[in-house]
Design a protein with these regions (language model features):
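Non-catalytic alpha-helical scaffolds and adjoining flexible linkers that form interface surfaces
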Residues: 1-214
Length: 214
């Protein structure tokens, strides 16, 4: 809680707004943590004028909150949020791609990364040019020999797979430095959005608004 943050002269007034990045010092009360001190390093006030960029931002915050747990170091998630909000303000990258990148990287940060480098069944590393499939139920890629009775496997192209591999391994500083074709973006959306929905137990209100606005 930020006590008195709504007062015009409160030192916490700016810090209580969404999309404010900084260092927050808290003290533990009887039933909650209270804000004691804050040092703001960046205000993303320009995001408020971005449509539908701001709704992407709200969704990213809600998804991060879903995975956040009290007492757990969430530094990686916080830094991911920071570079992601900056990416929303970059006119050279599609917000739809930003969403795909954030969702998959967040899943990886939470230990829910799908198997993208080896067949999830036989653990064999695919060779270049090999036909591969992505299974939501099996949480990763399958080669043709391991399809068996898997009924949800969808073919995944080499560019889409490479993009997903890059997303889960790149440093945060280089995470939003690539683009893809519209065809590959559609494929990433199909695989990643479905994977998120299958591995979370919540219907995100901000996502519902985003889908209406987009």
């Amino acid at each position: 809680f930020a006590k008195g943050a709504r007062r015009p002269n409160s030192q916490f007034l700016a810090a209580a707004n969404p999309f404010v990045f900084g260092t927050f010092a808290l003290y533990e009360g009887r039933s909650s943590y209270n804000l004691n001190q804050v040092s703001i390093s960046h205000h993303f006030v320009e995001l408020a004028g971005e449509q539908p960029g701001i709704y992407y931002g709200y969704y990213f915050l809600e998804l991060a909150d879903y995975f956040g747990q009290e007492g757990i170091d969430e530094k990686e998630s916080m830094n991911l949020l920071y570079v992601t909000v900056k990416a929303l303000l970059n006119p050279n990258i599609d917000n739809r791609l930003v969403r795909c990148i954030f969702e998959l990287r967040m899943m990886a940060a939470q230990g829910l990364c799908p198997s993208l480098f080896h067949c999830v069944c036989c653990e064999r590393q695919p060779v270049e040019g090999e036909e591969l499939f992505f299974s939501q139920q099996n949480h990763g890629i399958l080669d043709k020999a391991c399809l068996g009775h898997v009924n949800d496997a969808k073919r995944i192209s080499a560019p889409a797979l490479y993009a997903m591999q890059y997303i889960v391994t790149a440093s945060l500083g280089k995470l939003y430095t690539f683009t893809v074709t519209e065809e590959v973006l559609h494929e990433l959306e199909r695989h990643i959005h479905t994977y998120i929905a299958a591995n979370t137990e919540k219907r995100f209100k901000s996502l519902e608004i985003l889908e209406i606005m987009s």
